[in-house]
Curated annotation (Swiss-Prot):
One of its GO terms (molecular function) is rRNA binding. Part of the 30S ribosomal subunit. Contacts protein S5. The interaction surface between S4 and S5 is involved in control of translational fidelity. It comes from Bacillus cereus (strain Q1). One of the primary rRNA binding proteins, it binds directly to 16S rRNA where it nucleates assembly of the body of the 30S subunit. With S5 and S12 plays an important role in translational accuracy. Disulfide bonds: none annotated. Residues 92-152 form the S4 RNA-binding domain. GO terms for biological process: ribosomal small subunit biogenesis; translation. The keyword ATP-binding does not apply. This is Small ribosomal subunit protein uS4. Belongs to the universal ribosomal protein uS4 family. The lineage of its organism: Bacteria, Bacillati, Bacillota, Bacilli, Bacillales. Residues 22-42 are annotated as: Disordered. It comes from the Bacteria. Keywords: Ribonucleoprotein, Ribosomal protein, RNA-binding, rRNA-binding.
Length: 200
């Protein structure tokens, strides 16, 4: 299944979650798009709930189904809770950490920064958004990309960087000090439903 490239706001309303991180999609119309308005939502079956939760998380991180499932399977080989490990691996993606640093307003924009070669890891350019960052590694904006308008604008509006990143705004770099803990990850996701979905 290909990565979704359509209108993010429409998808956010359909899934009932803000994919932009701003919440603006759901402020005026907190219901799925369509001609029937707020009364069209149907009660989902158990399978429907599991599928919806899986889709919410997959689209939140902007991944294809193949990438998503591969990461899920990798998490199952780790010690500990499968669902939590899965969330931790998703959070360690390079494009996501660029977003968490505040270098981009959305994960989609962060993925473009990585794709276009503006980001380095430990001084080496990495243009693979799914690159898994390890604790202790440092993520930076390439020196020739420091003056990108999109980066400057994102930095101006960002007021939160998670504790597992130590961010230097002057250098536009951050060290991934440790893996995220479950309490630091999206609370609106029930990863147990996703484990159930793939266990069917």
């Amino acid at each position: 299944m290909a990565r979704y490239t359509g209108p993010a706001w429409k998808l956010s309303r359909r899934l009932g979650i803000s994919l932009s991180g701003t919440g603006k999609e759901l402020e005026k119309r907190p219901y799925a798009p369509g001609p029937h308005g707020p009364n069209q939502r149907k009660k989902l079956s158990e399978y429907g709930l599991q599928l919806q939760e899986k889709q919410k998380l997959r689209h939140m991180y902007g991944m294809t189904e193949r990438q998503f499932r591969r990461t899920f399977d990798q998490a199952g080989k780790m010690p500990g809770k499968h669902g939590e490990n899965f969330m931790i691996l998703l959070e360690a993606r390079l494009d996501n950490l660029v977003y968490r640093m505040g270098l981009a307003r959305t994960r989609r924009a962060a993925r473009q920064l990585v794709n276009h070669g503006h980001i380095t890891v430990d001084g080496s350019r990495v243009d693979i958004p799914s690159y898994r960052v390890k604790p202790g590694q440092t993520i930076s904006v390439r020196e020739k990309s420091n003056n990108l308008v999109v980066v400057k604008e994102a930095i101006e509006v960002n007021n939160f960087v998670p504790e597992y990143l130590t961010f230097d705004a002057d250098k536009l770099e951050a060290t991934y000090t440790r893996h995220a803990e479950r309490a630091e990850l999206p609370a609106e996701i029930n990863e147990a439903l996703i484990v159930e979905f793939y266990s069917r």
